């Protein structure tokens, strides 16, 4: 028997690290995250594997604009884990809202300055500062790999986390 739940993995809003994914990178990550593990605190250990993503979708919220003035979109993941005695407490913590926040481990080809378009670090602009009213952040472009999603205490992306318990058996 399996337990399923959905996640907001990442979005195109500026995060706590002053970075944001572009929509194309989120779309690519959607394909790359299928089959990836859910672990804890980005600790890459087979012992920590608790869940696995079996499906993703890019969700667009046309009614909400990001700091950059673009329609908000996010990568929604669907994950499963086995209903075992060892996972009983984790499932209870997910259902109770204790284990809620998540973060993703991934790679992108480029991080571009939102002010001038140069590779981040090759210009004088600093992430988190405003220039003529525009917030400087790193635009994360051209996703190349997805490693895992992790349950964490404080995610870089404030809205990332378990969305709701999905329940019984998924169509894998």
Task: Give the positions of each predicted feature.
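Signature of dsDNA virion morphogenesis modules
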Residues: 1-172
